[in-house]
Swiss-Prot record:
Sequence positions that bind Mg(2+): D128, G129, D338
PPM-type phosphatase domain mapped to chain residues: 95-347
Protein name as annotated: Protein phosphatase 1K, mitochondrial
GO terms for cellular component: mitochondrial matrix; mitochondrion
SMART domains on file: PP2C_SIG, PP2Cc
Organism: Xenopus laevis
PANTHER family per record: PROTEIN PHOSPHATASE
Localization of this protein: Mitochondrion matrix
Matching CDD domains: PP2Cc
Gene coding for it: ppm1k
Length: 373
């Protein structure tokens, strides 16, 4: 498809266009005389037209867009498509799947959030609190505001997220020291935040062990690495700061005998021991012909379901809402004791890499869990 088509539509005042409109424009620009470039089928809703979709030199068909021929029908964003030279589908927040399960805990300390921060930027986040839900609740309420504030003066989303994490930790510290609730000094939370600009520029920042992964061609592409004392550089920082690492009865390392992570928001009593709030970040340009979805998960899922299983479970589902629900319920069936939360964001190849039907067992041991995948 030529850029002229997209420019023409944009000049006519359209910022989004559905599949039918694009098909009509394509038909107008290209005659049907060249059989090698057009393939019509009577049993399909629309014709399939071959063109270089992603600049790779490989021809693609309309089927390459999973969302167009697989259960989710979203319009194309014209300005970003022209800017990046490839078709970029609109990400509708109402189609994003979210689910949280209590598990065997008395309280759900997980929080999740999704929002449109600007006309071009979407926000997705999961927070897994420990020692109470106060730190997770604080991030859930205020992280969005910090990010919005810093986006005004900074275009680089990685820098924005790093600054937002550090500032919200300072704000929580001020809040805790002014509170009469002493538990605020020892509670904390993980934070995994994803920003998506123009439907194609994805940036993820994280502290703790909540995860983000991209399903690309049916395989997991990890966007985060758990911050645990098992990581050599993390353990070294803890020791240099005067902290220490011990192992519990399950063989899991803990900072100063109490915290399973080396980075977090909160945990103010351990900040001087090397537990920092600075996130690690990852920047990715989406490939909508290959990328099926983004999923953010807390450790109630990650501890017991590995990354490939997460992709397989979601790829068997009809839509993201069902996928988030099934994933959190599967973690419960596997025997997780923790709260489990998932956000599933569909991309262009949703449904394209559908897994073969797999029967999942209702229980498993630590050896098969996702903590070590």
């Amino acid at each position: 498809m030529s850029t002229a088509i997209l420019v023409s539509l944009l000049r006519n005042g359209r910022c989004q266009v559905n599949r039918g409109a694009l098909t009509l424009c394509f038909q107008k620009e290209h005659s049907c005389t060249t059989s090698t470039r057009h393939c019509f089928s009577a049993n399909r809703r629309c014709f399939s037209s071959r063109f270089d979709l992603d600049g790779s030199g490989r021809p693609a068909t309309w089927d390459s867009f999973g969302i167009w021929d697989n259960r989710i029908d979203e319009p194309i964003q014209l300005p970003p498509s022209i800017k990046y030279g490839k078709l970029i589908p609109h990400i509708n927040l109402s189609k994003v799947g979210c689910s949280t399960q209590l598990g065997k805990r008395k309280e759900n300390e997980d929080r999740f959030k999704l929002a449109r921060l600007t006309p071009d930027i979407l926000y997705f986040a999961v927070y897994d609190g420990h020692g109470g839900a106060s730190a997770a609740e604080f991030c859930d309420r205020f992280m969005e505001d910090y990010i919005k504030e810093f986006l005004v003066e900074e275009h680089d989303m990685e820098k924005v997220l790093v600054k937002a994490f550090l500032e919200i930790n300072k704000a929580f510290a001020r809040h805790a020291h002014l509170s009469v609730d002493a538990s605020l000094l020892t509670c904390g939370t993980t934070a995994t935040v994803a920003l998506l600009r123009d439907g194609i520029e994805l940036v993820v920042a994280s502290v703790g062990d909540s995860r983000a992964l991209l399903c690309r061609r049916g395989k997991p592409f990890k966007l985060t690495i758990d911050h645990t004392p098992e990581r050599k550089e993390e353990k070294l920082r803890i020791k240099k700061s005067g902290g220490f690492v011990t192992w519990n009865s399950l063989g899991q390392p803990n900072v100063n005998g109490r915290l399973a992570m080396t980075r977090s928001i909160g945990d103010l009593d351990l900040k001087s021991m090397g537990v920092i709030a600075e996130p690690e970040t990852k920047r990715v340009k989406l490939q909508h012909t290959d990328d099926g979805f983004l999923v953010l998960t807390t450790d109630g899922i990650n501890f017991i379901v590995n990354s490939q299983e997460i992709c397989d479970i979601i790829n068997q589902c009809h839509d993201p809402k069902e996928a988030a629900q099934v994933l959190t319920e599967q973690a419960i069936q596997y025997g997780t004791e923790d709260n489990s939360t998932a956000i599933v964001v569909p991309f262009g190849a949703w449904g394209k890499h559908k897994s073969s039907e797999v029967s999942f067992s209702f229980s498993r041991g630590f050896a098969s869990s996702g903590r070590w995948d």
